[in-house]
């Protein structure tokens, strides 16, 4: 039989402050509302090549050095490809990052139980499938939602809450449809936009249950990854002085 939870008066409920993981990547933390909420699920979308995987590898690296375990599950790149990028953009790689080259969400769940991470990164959601889902190819709205619901259960587990960040590729029409459905499910939606300036990236929060929407953080894509532009005014002023005007900076 179903167990009904007690009905409470709103005035009797004790409000709780969100428990967050601070990454130390200033613009990322600011756009997120002060860091990653521990029982949250976030989707980050962009066109291919915008820097999603690079930024999240930096996020994983940063919090791993603060003692948090991270599972980075990739259905797009091999573990050696991920290691090559890490060697290029990171220093002193932490032992707290586990890389899983996988397209089975069921196997990700098993790995999560074994490793017990604080953060799970899925790159990208369109490459994963669930065995018990209706027959459909990876990237279809059906598979995308089944995988996302499984990740939601992991994130919102009362006994062991975890943060989950999902990468979503903006490519085919049906994959975009799956992402739009995901926006209603997740807590936070982040979009990376590449400007006319080849180096400049904007990280925008179009939805955030734990912070302000419409926040924009600025990054510069360099050989060492996505560098947080902690003083955008100074950055844009320098660009103007150099005669290299940036669209959207006026």
Question: Which residues fall in each region the model found?
Answer:
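Conserved P-loop NTPase
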Residues: 1-10, 113-119, 126-128, 185, ...
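The Walker A/P-loop phosphate-binding site
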Residues: 2-92, 109, 113, 244-250
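P-loop NTPase motor core
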Residues: 39-43, 48, 54-55, 92, ...
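Short beta-alpha junctions and helix-cap segments that line functional grooves
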Residues: 59, 85, 176-179, 202-205, ...
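Residues at the starts of beta-strands that form the adenosine-phosphate
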Residues: 69-70, 96, 163
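Glycine- and other small-residue-rich loops at beta-strand/loop junctions that grip anionic moieties
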Residues: 75, 97-101
